[in-house]
């Protein structure tokens, strides 16, 4: 692997290399292409998520409250939604995620997030408050249909380098950790008992992680029919 990826500048000497670069990992993408790991898989999909932490007025704070929304300010054909978590110490975690497969070339994800905060239900929460931190990151949204083969000679992909994010829940930390645990178990068997690294994928398909991603497999694709039909189908499914 080191000859194909980094040439003579760096020599990686180990039995198994675990790639955990996160969404759009540079080496992970090269490995997927080189070893054709995404053969017969759907193209990977991506989104962008914005998050702000606000310190708000005590009267507007309800510790433990969780809110999720879909739709506005996006139109019915653009995938996206928000999250609002009322944390401790009068803090609110406020965020918005937009799928990067939107069709309108004039759409600005950042500006849509700012518009979202003008909604009366959101404005009343943060009014009089203070934004204390902010950030943005890419999200991997393809789900299990886009998940590549996660093993190859001498290497494994874990977490968002493979694409284990649970998109409907916008949660990927627990899935990344579980994939890392499964990778460690497979590597141990590979070293101790000479088991093939394909064991990693076998363990994955027997785990709660696979079940969780499988259950969420139709949520993102269903929104290709628009917001209303997507919500109805997701509820039925």
Task: Go through the PLM ranges and name each one.
Residues 33-65:
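Central beta-strand plus flanking loop segment that forms part of the substrate or channel wall
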Residues 12-23, 155:
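Short hydrophobic core segments
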